[in-house]
Amino acid sequence: CLHNWKPEWEIWNDFGLSRAAASRVDALKSTHPIECPVNHPDEAAEMFDVISYEKGCSVLYQIHEFIGGETFRRGIAAYLKKHSYGNTETHDLWDALEEACQKAAAESGKAEPEPVRLIMDKWVFTPGHPVLEVSGDKCAITFKQRPFKFLSTDDKTLWPIPVCLKARVKGKGLVEKRFLMQEAQLTMDVAKELSGDGELECLVVNAGGSGFYRVTYDKHFTSLITKDVNGNLSTIERFNLVNDAWACVRAGILSAADYLNLIQVF
């Protein structure tokens, strides 16, 4: 509502700082799920922190951007109407949003509606978040996910990641693609999925900056992005690029030298 009323305030750029704060806490071993069982009133008070608020808001914004604002609003309206003057549980909201996705898919002829409950149950009831490692060349892109932690871990948790891509293709301009990644590794054919006969000039993962996950690129895709940082990335995408890179240095995924090379282009 605030963004639609005052878009010049760029509220989601400002929220990027809050999301980054939640990501830092969520990368600790001491993190907790957004929703936890409460057996005593004192335990409820303990839940009011950056995870329940900022991460909670982040995953809602993530699904909002993935399914689309209009579909999200339809789901919220149906949820409020169905449960007015009543009590609800968490899954009631996800079911309402999923029904809205099913209706939107039927109207548009889309084969598969977004499985909102599957996505949100994982993000709400599982502590932590993933890092998406992007590598490849002009022909193929490989995405790998794993839990993001500042300290090494044997955790093999997989998330259903709502991935939003933005690609700049020679002769075609900007091409956008959204997909749900549930596998540990996924390889995408560039020509088939993005560029066609055109040359891939730049690739941005987590386009729009709404995803609650880290992204790190190999040297090939980093070089494409940094050829024109201001032209290729929005404000929040530039912030996420630097913030994710520094977090990956702290986690031992990226070297300090690579980070310094990155920030020199700004």
Task: Label each residue range with its predicted role.
Residues G209-G211, G252:
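Peripheral, non-catalytic segments that deliver or gate enzyme domains
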Residues G211-K227:
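Edge strands and adjacent loops of beta-rich recognition modules
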